[in-house]
Amino acid sequence: RVSIYSARRPLLARTHIQGRVYNFLERPTGWKCFVYHFAVFLIVLVCLIFSVLSTIEQYVALATGTLFWMEIVLVVFFGTEYVVRLWSAGCRSKYVGVWGRLRFARKPISIIDLIVVLASMVVLCVGSKGQVFATSAIRGIRFLQILRMLHVDRQGGTWRLLGSVVFIHRQELITTLYIGFLGLIFSSYFVYLAEKDAVNESGQVEFGSYADALWWGVVTVTTIGYGDKVPQTWVGKTIASCFSVFAISFFALPAGILGSGFALKVQQKQRQKHFNRQIPAAASLIQTAWRCYAAENPESSTWNIYVRKPTRSHTLLSPSPKPKKSVMVKKKKFKLDKDNGVSPGEKTLTVPHITCEPVSEKRRPDHFSVDTCDSSVKSPMLLEVSTTHFLRTNSVAEDLDLEGETPLVPITHVSQLREHHRATIKVIRRMQYFVAKKKFQQARKPYDVRDVIEQYSQGHLNLMVRIKELQRRLDQSIGKPSLFISVSEKSKDRGSNTIGARLNRVEDKVAQLDQRLVLITDMLQQLLSLHHGGPPGSRPPSGGGAQVQPCGPTNPELFLPGNALPTYEQLTVPRRGPEEGS
């Protein structure tokens, strides 16, 4: 980054004054602009109130005389303001020169201001009789005062906001107005057909024409209800009541649409403003993160911003007597700032510059001093922090005072940067990164209570979804009947799907398996005894093989088909009956 400095702060030029005046009048920001424009609005409002009072007989004399002097003051004030606005517009390039001023004067609000000023001057010069206005002049003054109310909103923000809301919701507004207009003309026509021959109590026909019916329809569907025209027959009243409910509902919809549109527009502006505050914080975070990454890069371009270009007037060794260290440091700092075009006491945006004390070749390495002084670090927030001067030496301080001080030499090349310089720069960059990260996190926080509530509701909804999913899996694991099972199946298996019932079935199956294993063991023993040719229950010969304990006589029921091993379906389907475990 290359910083360009000026010798001193420039004086206020003509264009600068024009710019400040133009921003004050045309782009009001701040409490001073608010006070000024609000005072102008109050003056115009008071003048309008006096013009209203001039129509009341009790206050004619007081209001007319006061209104005369107020009009003179307002004409002079608005005329002067118009000239100042025309002059200050020259700060912008498109309004420079005569043609630029004419372009500024062709703006609608400028035309209205000019008309008000000229018309007020004409009324004051022609329509006044002494210190009061004529009756015809007062009528013109009232109209001009109404036009002055447009002066309050010179930027047209109100009209732009209304236009944007109408444009966004144009489809809904067109639909409601179209349907409401159809309801109006149909209701008016049917009421006219029913009431065209009806006579009221005074003997007059209220709905003598279709125009009278349309007037009644407009007054009815807009919920004004003057009561000047009322249906007389029951047929007309029935038609009017039916169509009124339908038409009034559609004529009331545009108000709700515009209200919701304004609310959404305000919320959108707040979100955009909150997002705009995040952009500088994000850019600063990206910049500091990149600088931290670049600090690990050995390329010279990373460190060039900390190197000061050499000056011609700078000499390493001065033949003059060396001043004391404190005086020398102050003069050196003033000289370096002056060389860079920075006046004393002026805060500018710079990068840290590093200076060091040159080491003489004759001096031994054991006796050297490194002075990292005058490294003024100025952050982007224009806060100047001057580092202290560290002196490292293993000699006595008195010897240094006797020997004098070596003038500090700014680092003019990347190769002169030492390891402690690079380490310091890395630490500073790391600190700047953490500060930028904290600011970005603060900028990301919700700006409104509604956003906090919305985030809480969204988090609560996600939590409930996860809880329901966990409950579903738990029900599936413990055997709870699903939602798609019919009511009859639920009532049939109400007690068999609990954990206790399932454990009981498992225990029953284990007992059945134990009995089957006992039967299988008996069958194997019987088969083994028959294989050796002995009577059932006799011992086999001891010529080898396993010794089998004798058992009782052969049970013929063991070989029945019913004693076969149970199938998978028999093990899974529970038996119902008192002898299930036998």
From Swiss-Prot:
Single annotated GO MF: voltage-gated potassium channel activity involved in ventricular cardiac muscle cell action potential repolarization
PTMs per UniProt: Phosphorylated by PKA; increases delayed rectifier potassium channel activity of the KCNQ1-KCNE1 complex through a macromolecular complex that includes PKA, PP1, and the targeting protein AKAP9. Ubiquitinated by NEDD4L; promotes internalization. The ubiquitinylated form is internalized through a clathrin-mediated endocytosis by interacting with AP2M1 and is recycled back to the cell membrane via RAB4A and RAB11A.
Segments on the Extracellular side according to the record's topology features: 54-64, 130-137, 195-210, 232-233
Renumbered residue ranges of the record's region C-terminal assembly domain (tetramerization): 500-531
Catalytic activity: K(+)(in) = K(+)(out)
Ranges that cross the membrane: 32-53, 65-87, 104-129, 138-153, 172-194, 234-259
Modified residues (Phosphoserine): 318, 320
Disulfide topology: none
Cytoplasmic topology ranges: 1-31, 88-103, 154-171, 260-582
Localization, UniProt: Cell membrane; Cytoplasmic vesicle membrane; Early endosome; Membrane raft
Known regulation of activity: PIP2 molecule is essential to activate KCNQ channels by inducing the coupling of the voltage-sensing domain (VSD) and the pore-forming domain (PD). Upon channel activation, PIP2 disrupts the VSD-calmodulin/CALM interactions, causing the release of CALM from the VSD which triggers the opening of the gate. Calcium potentiates KCNQ1 channel current through calcium-bound CALM. Calcium-bound CALM competes with PIP2 to stabilize the channel open state.
UniProt intramembrane stretches: 211-231
Coiled coil location: 496-532
Region (Interaction with KCNE3): 149-157
One GO cellular component term: early endosome
Membrane topology: Multi-pass membrane protein
Region feature (Interaction with AKAP9): 499-527
Chain residues that bind a 1,2-diacyl-sn-glycero-3-phospho-(1D-myo-inositol-4,5-bisphosphate): 155
GO biological process, any: membrane repolarization
Region (Disordered): 530-582
Region annotation (Interaction with KCNE1 C-terminus) ranges: 446-483
Primary localization: membrane
Subunit structure: Tetramer. Heterotetramer with KCNE1; targets to the membrane raft. Interacts (via C-terminus) with CALM; forms a heterooctameric structure (with 4:4 KCNQ1:CALM stoichiometry) in a calcium-independent manner. Interacts with AKAP9; targets protein kinase A (PKA) catalytic and regulatory subunits and protein phosphatase 1 (PP1) to the KCNQ1-KCNE1 complex, allowing PKA-mediated phosphorylation and increase of delayed rectifier potassium channel activity.
Function: Pore-forming subunit of the voltage-gated potassium (Kv) channel involved in the regulation of cardiomyocyte excitability and important in normal development and functions of myocardium, inner ear, stomach and colon. Associates with KCNE beta subunits that modulates current kinetics. Induces a voltage-dependent by rapidly activating and slowly deactivating potassium-selective outward current. Also promotes a delayed voltage activated potassium current showing outward rectification characteristic.
Database matches in PANTHER family: POTASSIUM VOLTAGE-GATED CHANNEL SUBFAMILY KQT MEMBER 1 (PTHR47735:SF14), POTASSIUM VOLTAGE-GATED CHANNEL SUBFAMILY KQT MEMBER 4 (PTHR47735)
Protein name: Potassium voltage-gated channel subfamily KQT member 1
Organism (species): Felis catus (Cat)
Gene: KCNQ1
